[in-house]
Amino acid sequence: MKGKVLLGMSGGIDSTVSAMLLLEQGYEVVGCTFRTFDSIKESCLAREKGCCSVESIMEAKHNAEQMGFEHHIVDFRETFRRCVIQNFIDEYMAGRTPNPCVLCNSHIKWGELVRVADELGCDYIATGHYARIRERDGHLYLAAAADTRKDQTYFLWMLTEDQLRRTIFPLGDLTKDQVREIARQHGYETLAEKKESQEICFVTDNDYRTFLRANVPDYDERVRAGEYVDKDGKVLGTHQGYVNYTIGQRKGLGIALGAPAYVTHIDAATNRVTLGTNDDLLATELRFRPMTNDTRLTTNDQRLTTNSPMTAKVRYRSQAVPVTNYQLPINNQTGSLFFREPVWGVTPGQSVVLYQDGLVVGGGIII
């Protein structure tokens, strides 16, 4: 037996196939599924399906029983509400666009998995994420998955080296098509054909506006009609409340300017939304703040090598772009990145993730 592994299970194909692979490799597997919320307001349960729904929890438990290993349902509702949902609300109400998956991975899926693993005597933790772990100069790094289309390192950049030391990514060297084929070979035809959800797990139909209205007590007082302005401050028209817009948005603006208009800036304090052209969304630099106590991205960090180019991703679906220069955060202050070519849609609240030689060397939250 190679060791005891606590596997985070969602009931979906990725974690289920991860269990199959770990068992075949000789690990003792223990399944764990999170109960993160249960009210209609916090509402993936309202649609009855999804990674956190009652159905998915029961499916994970059923799959574990079929494969012959124990399964635990762990109540993380309070932690999830405090760390993930409240941050999601606060960021949107501040005029920023958050990425809750980043916080969930570091604080819930790893922070709590490690705690539960210790309680159950597990040596390792594992998930069905598409990522790998590599060693360089005595340090462990996240590395891009073999399936570049599914690579999830963008969402995992906050993981610390200590967390990586105990982590196994069974799917890191596989493509999604290979994972589906493994599921079919083990008799999970329905799971192999099941469509993947791209929604935020606690927001029904990705309608974050309805979610905010239901979860912010003074929503109607804080979210009111305001001014659309151009980059020079000229008033162009009236918007329906700043939280209804995100950087780069073009559709649903409710205003005709004779040319395509995009949201380029949101100011929650003044309730103003700036509109501009597509070119106004191009930037050659950005500022970011660190969001981890790990040693990465400090000026004395030995992980950053000067003889290898660095690239950055500012969105999950975007390509990593070359970084020509950078100023790293000191004493938890902000840092700056400068790009060779203009980058489209730099969005406050989203993550920027830094790579060298396919390894994640750090990241931050765009400001």
Stretches found by the model and what they are:
Residues 1-157, 168, 176-178:
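ATP-dependent adenylation/nucleotidyltransferase module used to activate substrates
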